Amino acid sequence: MRLQFKRRQVLTGVGLALGAACLRPSLAGDGRLLTATDVHVSDYPTVEAVRWIGQQLEAETAGRLSLRVYHSGQLGRENDQIDMARHGAIDITRVYSGALNNGWPRTIALGLPYLIRSKAHLRALIDGEVGTRILEGFAARGLVGLAIYDSGSRSVYNTRGPLRTPEDLRGLKLRVPPSDIFLDLMRALGANPTPLSFGEVFSALETRLIDGAENNIRSFHSSRQFEIAGYWSETQHSYAPDILVMSKRNFESLSADDQSLLRALAQRSVAVM
C-alpha cells in the first residue's frame, strides 16, 4: 500500500503547519507548552482523555510541561494533523486508526471487518503484544505511538431508509475513511464508498452528496449527524480504535524522564475514556 498526496492536500497541510507553528507561544524559562489536536468536539471522550494527560503532566512537572488541546478540527483534517505531527509542527494528535492504514500497515489488522468480536476482545489484543507492536511501528515514519483508545463498534447510518438485509446497501453512497480496507468492504457489500474526512460528513449529508456513512455511535451523536441521517443500522462491522501519536522529532527532544512520564500518562488516560 502507498500514500498518495494531491498538490492541494500538500499545500493545505503546509498552510496548517505554518498556522500551528504560529500558535506556539514564546516559552519562558524552562517551561514548554505541548500542542495536541483532535477533530472531535470539546467534550468527546478522547479530547477529555488528552486534556487529562495535560493536567497530570503539568502537575507532575510542577508546570514545567503543559499541554493545550485544539479540538473540533481547529487545525484541519486528521490527515493534515498526521502530517503536521510527522514534521514537528504539532506535538500530539488523536486520530482514527483507519486514517493511518495506508501509511502504517500494522494498523490495518485492527480494522479488518468482523475480525474483532467485542470490546473485551479488542482490549485483549491492544493491551497485549499486538498493541505493543502496532505502537512500535509508528517510529519508522516519524511518529511515536502513545496509546490506543477503544472507540466502540462502527455501524452504518443513512438518510434513505432502514437496512434490513445486506442487499439494502446496494447503490448507497456511503462515506468511509480514507482507507483501502473500508473502500473494499463497502464495494464488496454493493455500496458506493466515498472517502471523506470526518469534518466533511455533515455537509455532505446535508447536500445529499452522500446517502450515509459509517462510524461509532459517539461520533454519530457528537457531530449531530443524526439530525440528517435518521436510520441507524447496527452492523458492527468494525471495532477499529483510535490511536494517540506524537511527533517523533518532538518526543525525542524531551528528556528520558519526561518521555517515560508522557508514555505512562498516555497509557493511564485509556481508563479516562
Task: Pin down the residues of each PLM region.
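N-terminal secretory/targeting leader peptides
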Residues: 2-5, 9-121, 129-130, 136-273
